[in-house]
Amino acid sequence: MNKDVMFSKEINNEEIRMESTLKYLLYAISAVALITGANVLIGGADAVPGSSGPVEATVDNELRFFSVYWVAFGVFCFWVARNINTQAFFVPFIALFFLLGGIGRLVSTLAIGAPASILVPAMVLEFVLPVVIYGLYWKHQKMNITKHSTGLASGSRG
């Protein structure tokens, strides 16, 4: 086996692993967003972990309203994951908006106080996963550029 073929197989295996990891992360975010968004849409403020006692009608109203956008984000993540080869352009934006959600939680924590203990790991994930997702996206894009510039995309070299 010559070096060009070995190089091509190494790139393909690594690219497949990165793409699969990226897709599964997007599917996981999608599942969490769909489940938790639907839960809050149906259950209102009582469905939020750590919520206890009566809640102001305005807060419940806002939570149910914004839960629809969380569900939509889940659908969008699913669509991008399912069509990653043609919709990879959206991955950095997904990472950015996920990070902004974490920043929102941090602002709330600093301004109001710590949330229910289950939401603290969620906030940590909202800071870590966007970096991982963007890193995978960047490396995947870089590999695609390398593959196309070396002629590996068409299966021929030189």
Which role fits each region the language model picked out?
Residues 127-148:
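Membrane-water interface at the C-terminal end of transmembrane alpha helices
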